[in-house]
Amino acid sequence: MGRAPCCEKMGLKRGPWTAEEDRILVAHIERHGHSNWRALPRQAGLLRCGKSCRLRWINYLRPDIKRGNFTREEEDAIIHLHDLLGNRWSAIAARLPGRTDNEIKNVWHTHLKKRLEPKPSSGREAAAPKRKATKKAAAVAVAIDVPTTVPVSPEQSLSTTTTSAATTEEYSYSMASSADHNTTDSFTSEEEFQIDDSFWSETLAMTVDSTDSGMEMSGGDPLGAGGASPSSSNDDDMDDFWLKLFIQAGGMQNLPQI
């Protein structure tokens, strides 16, 4: 939707109004009213647009327009209405008889708005505690995020690594020495208490020799010197021999390990 052509394109006048134009506009509005601002310039015979005629009438040519400065009551009313209506200047002007929306807007931006704004000093004082609180919160956050580990210098790290390596090497050497000692002891015990076949062969040979010598000493007498049976004496000797042998073998096994 295109914008409607304005004053210069339609051959209408722009700029300040003359006294003759003001008189024609006032006479037409007093006679016919201003129900249609778009058709009013053509009906009144003015080379102006409808918007220019409306603003000239409302802001300058109305009979009830107040001239001069705003009173204290009017300023308070503008502040209150601005809180309720915002920047709706026409609605505010409708509740202030004799004042135009253009005048109200100008006095608001020139005087009233600056009066309501806080002073720079108070603003800085209010912002200072907020900045302090923000700094404290940032400090607490940094303290929480900092890791508890303490940084170690390269020299300390190298010494720690060397010490741990030496400790590990000593422990490995002690374990190996203990294992070798246990193995040597077990081998020594087995070698000391191992009874091979040669031991029993020598023992049996000694038994046979002692038996033969006993029989020779008896002189072939079946009953011996005391009238006892040779077989019974030999049996007793054999029993005593085997008993001593087993006792000696048991004692050797009960010897403490070196």
Swiss-Prot record:
Keywords: DNA-binding, Nucleus, Repeat, Stress response, Transcription, Transcription regulation
Induction info: Induced by cold stress and flooding.
Cell compartments where the protein resides: Nucleus
UniProt DNA-binding region: 37-61, 89-112
Location of region: Disordered: 211-234
GO CC annotations, alphabetized: nucleus
Record InterPro entries: Homeodomain-like_sf, Myb_dom, Myb_TF_plants, SANT/Myb
Gene Ontology MF annotations: DNA binding
UniProt domain HTH myb-type: residue ranges: 9-61, 62-116
Effect of loss of the gene: No visible phenotype under normal growth conditions, but mutant plants exhibit increased tolerance to cold stress.
Known role: Acts as a negative regulator of cold tolerance. Negatively regulates beta-amylase genes at the transcriptional level in response to cold stress. Suppresses beta-amylase gene expression by interacting with TIFY11A/JAZ9. Maltose produced by beta-amylases has a role in protecting cell membranes under cold stress conditions in rice and may contribute to the cold tolerance as a compatible solute.
Subunit structure: Interacts with TIFY11A/JAZ9.
Name by which UniProt lists this protein: Transcription factor MYB30
Organism the protein comes from: Oryza sativa subsp. japonica
